Amino acid sequence: MRRNYIREKKILCGDSYMAVGLYAITPQEHKARGKKQKESSTDQKSRNKVSSLRQKQRKAIANFDKYGFFLTGTFEEAFLPDDILACKREVVNYKRRVIAATCKRFGVSRDKIRVMLWAVRKGEAGRLHMHGFVECMGMRQSERREFREMLEDLWRRRIPGTNEYEPLGTMNADRIDMKKLLGNDGTTQGKHGTVGYIYGHKERICVESKNLKLPVEQPPNDTKWSRKQLHTACGDMQNDAYWWGTRFPGWTLEKCVVYDPEELHQSEQQREDGWEVTEPQCYVILSRKG
């Protein structure tokens, strides 16, 4: 009977990317995942936050590419929301305006417009503002230039009693940098990239369009990897693109993040010798070749 199980958990993120988690599991987990019995501890809640971050990053790379835009919207003092919920209402209204205006101006259907926005505040004394991603699928380059101007112009509010508008503040729409989104551009945004930067805000509420594609989790493979291969992946071959290409033919390494034991996955039941709690874990993002 096999004693050592290393789980390979693959998640397809749209047509172009795949995330893979590699970590040791117990024989009980290999047979079936048990029901959660206890409330999360503080440490586990912290891990759940990072897990949520990774899920959002996977969702972002499944839906947005270099033809989309990363948005940052700020408020002038006169329009600064009172709290995060009021900020969320402004973000929801902005999403509605973007979808309606895009359909009208470019003659596209709503399902072509993908939106993932956050109302955020960094720290208790920080100012409320907005970050997020927007993309309209199938646009020509000339249309994207016009779309970008429209995204910046729609950060506004109607002047009561008139048909005129005034800006809520500043809105910057920049082309999505996939290296920043993936977290492999070497900047201060860190290993979780743009989404990690957004999650660095103490208060945040996500507002999404309903048509976003969900990453697809594949059935786990618990017998493909050995402990020695896991150590190799987390050690000498962590950043070796050729080696990862041989492990996953047809895919190219984008990044590999090595975690301390139990940071990526924590076994709910430990085996007697407890070896799985001492094993390194890694999280890999790959892009499809061609």
Name each region found by the language model.
Residues 1-128, 136-290:
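Right-hand nucleic-acid polymerase module
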